[in-house]
Structures are given as structure tokens and as C-alpha cells.
């Protein structure tokens, strides 16, 4: 049976301050610029969750959408919408609440929960995409998906000056 991908898009508004405790104040300002504002700043995020699995012959669907929406509400919207991300236990410490790190946390939660949405446990998380601005978006492929992108031969990369 072919594997199909289904993507659902969610919206949330949240604020954060990018500040690494391992850097001094000047290094933080140099690294994060206006994103290091002591009061934080906000974004209207769009989060795409892509799942992969067989199409159910009875329903014609890859995923039970109300179950996926309930998971997103509980683990994404209720947790981060209208919140200051620095107050979240995951980001309350050395883990800077960048959009990339938000993606890592969302991927971690959904990777464990998505298979439970399917009684046959054939459904898998494929990708998390977070759009931070109209110009910036971040994709995280779930483990197993990224292996196909890693070349078997390692090439030496030169740093960009």
C-alpha cells in the first residue's frame, strides 16, 4: 500500500527573548540584535505538521483529522499560544527559545504522539515546518526521514569567511 503525506497548518502567537546564558550581554546583543530585547518580541507563527502513513481503505484518509487537531491543541496551541516562550520549562534555562529550538521541541512531542493517533501504529511524523515571518521558515525532518539526505561520503566543507 502506498504511503501518503498529509499536512495540517496551525497558527499561534507567542513572544520570546533570544538570550544565551553562556554569552555576556554584549555578545548576546551582537548575536541576536533586536531579538535580544530584554522585554522580548512576538511572532505570529504558522506551524505545519506533516504525517505519513497508508491511506485507510475504509475512510480514505491518512489520519483522523479531529485527533490530530486535538493533539495540536493540547501540545502546541494550549502550551505556546499567547505565551512568552522563555517561561516554558523547556526554555527556562540554557535552551534558547529560537524558532529552530521551538521546532525541535514540537518535533519531539509530535514524534512520540503521532503513532498513537492510528490504531494500527503505521502513522509517523514526517516533518515539522515553522514559519516565523514571511521570509523565515524552518523545517525539521523526523528521524529516519533525514537519513536519506545525508550523503554516504563525507566531504570536507570549508568555512565561509
Language-model features: locations:
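Charge-rich, low-complexity N-terminal segments
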Residues: 1-161
Amino acid at each position: 500500500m502506498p504511503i501518503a503525506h498529509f499536512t495540517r497548518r496551525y497558527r499561534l502567537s507567542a513572544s520570546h527573548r533570544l538570550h544565551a546564558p553562556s554569552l555576556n550581554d554584549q555578545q548576546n546583543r551582537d548575536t541576536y540584535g533586536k531579538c535580544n530585547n530584554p522585554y522580548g518580541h512576538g511572532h505570529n507563527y504558522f506551524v505545519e505538521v506533516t504525517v505519513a502513513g497508508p491511506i485507510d481503505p475504509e475512510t480514505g484518509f491518512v489520519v483522523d483529522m479531529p485527533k490530530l487537531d486535538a493533539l495540536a491543541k493540547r501540545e502546541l496551541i494550549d502550551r505556546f499560544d499567547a505565551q512568552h516562550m522563555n517561561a516554558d520549562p523547556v526554555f527556562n534555562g540554557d535552551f534558547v527559545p529560537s524558532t529552530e529550538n521551538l521546532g525541535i521541541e514540537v518535533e519531539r512531542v509530535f514524534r512520540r504522539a503521532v503513532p498513537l493517533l492510528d490504531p494500527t501504529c503505521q502513522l509517523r511524523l514526517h516533518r515539522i515546518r515553522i514559519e516565523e515571518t514571511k521570509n523565515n521558515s524552518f523545517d525539521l525532518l523526523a528521524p529516519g526521514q533525514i537519513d536519506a539526505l545525508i550523503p554516504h561520503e563525507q566531504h570536507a566543507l570549508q568555512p565561509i569567511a
